Amino acid sequence: VSFKHRIILLSLVSLFSIFTLSYFLLTEAQHSLKNAESLEKSVILSTKISELVHELQKERGRTAGFLGSGGKTFKKELQEQRKLTDLKIKELEKYLNKEYVSSLSGEAQKLFLSVILNGLDNLSQVRVKVDSLQISLEDAINFYTKLNSDLIDSVALLAKNSKNAEIANELLAYTNFMYAKDKAGLERAVLSVAFANKMFPDSKLFTKFVDLLAQQKAFIKSFSLAAPERVIDFYKKTVVSSGPSEQVLNYERLALTSPFTEGALNVDPNQWFRIITQKIDLMHKVELFIAKDLIGKIKEVKLEAKSRFNGVLVVSVVAIAVILIVSIASLRVRGE
């Protein structure tokens, strides 16, 4: 075998090896990039769901006030709140297109389609019944609570399907915090009734109150176990050490101490509603902080994936070019 043929054979073997290695590395890098892009969509979707849940929680509170007063109060506030809710629904539906839904797992697809096609579609029907006082307060509250629960469950599924452990954990923390905040919203309604009556009207409502406290505690504990330290610190600084949280705690202690003593819960229900709403608004600030942190983190993951892909591509092209240049140069030198 001549020197020329040996050089050509060696070059072909080297090129084949480089092409093969580059193909596998580029495929892996491209796969990582696609995962990062898919994860980015999931994170953005989670933040949009959180914003919608926040507005639905406020609409649930306004609806409870409207129905509880027999339609005499909160009418204007309820109509204004519905507009804010509708705005967030449109934002979610715009982002949640068919192509994206089809890329989700079967379980997530089923839940999203159920929420969008059933829950949100039924919202308009429930509103009509509320306006005409054709639905009970309990049924209306249960509808909103079920809808919120389904929406939060969808965020939990996105966390479950995430292939990035760090982001999956923070999404899980995000989910648990959303659950805790939703339970705080229900507590707001329950104690509003108790304070309006200056006692718990029955043991069922008191049991509901105790259960809500236990659920909030459990969700906050799960949140604390999964959340990064910076998020926990922000939560403690923003919510735990705040004035509204201290006041809410005092109201809760009073309700637990004398639940059935007539006149013992001598608290202005409007004052209670205002204070716990302040606490819930502070909790929403934590949600926004987590969302911002998640989006910042996913941008880093995406940038790293892009850099890896571009790096592999550049190294592959340079390696191929070097082999070709060396081979051609060797053939020329031999030819001379």
Which sequence ranges carry the predicted segments?
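Hydrophobic alpha-helical segments
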Residues: 1-335
